Amino acid sequence: MKIDILTLFPEMFAPLEHSIVGKARKKGLLEINYHNFRENAEKSRHVDDEPYGGGQGMLLRAQPIFDAYDAIEKKQPRVILLDPAGRTFDQAYAEELAKEEELIFICGHYEGYDERIKMLVTDEISLGDYVLTGGELAAMTMIDATVRLIPEVIGKEASHTDDSFSSGLLEYPQYTRPYEYRGMVVPEVLMSGHHENIRKWRLYESLKKTYLRRPDLLEDYDFTEEETAFLDQIKESLERENL
């Protein structure tokens, strides 16, 4: 995968030299290029200007971003504009991006963009319902979530298919050694070696966590008969606890 990032602050992306993303780059599975579009600004070096019609703040000008974009060697990239008004980023979208060969991220700053910049864009994406100073942190988050899904980056597919959201549910609780720590013990079912019982326990706990913390994820979830039965048990158990 090849990723190009248009930004005023390329130095902010140093974390992408480390961990999973850094390893993917060293393996040759990922190429990341940074393009400081201030270098594409006209002689004044100004990348922003006041909005026509008045208003607060400054807008990024179209010219530096268009010129930076034009200078990138590309075929048919997915061009992502980081914008609070865009579609909310989620795991399903990360899975979409992981199938692409070329991605371009445009990171904004200041009050917003000249609307004409959006002529370059295929996707307008938001990290969530809040405003960041710039698009760099959002871009890094999306890149990390996407790159780890590329085949061979993590190694074992199960490492990410069991993650929260990959199945549509939050991930079940997990434990490692020691068996007992400060009076807290590992659930016996996980010590049993009985794979089917462990699978059922994990599914039950995933459903329970999702029902309690993110019930919105269950609204469009396609339940199996087993999952429906487990959810009924969870609701009955919680009702008894509240009596």
Curated annotation (Swiss-Prot):
Gene3D superfamilies on file: 3.40.1280.10, tRNA(m1g37)methyltransferase, domain 2 (1.10.1270.20)
EC number: 2.1.1.228
Locations listed in the record: Cytoplasm
Binding of S-adenosyl-L-methionine, residues: G108, L127, G128, D129, Y130, V131, L132
InterPro entries linked: Alpha/beta_knot_MTases, tRNA_m1G_MeTrfase_C_sf, tRNA_m1G_MeTrfase_TrmD, tRNA_m1G_MTases_N, tRNA_MeTrfase_TRMD/TRM10
GO cellular component annotations of the record: cytosol
CDD domains to which the protein is assigned, alphabetical: TrmD-like (cd18080)
Protein's name in the database: tRNA (guanine-N(1)-)-methyltransferase
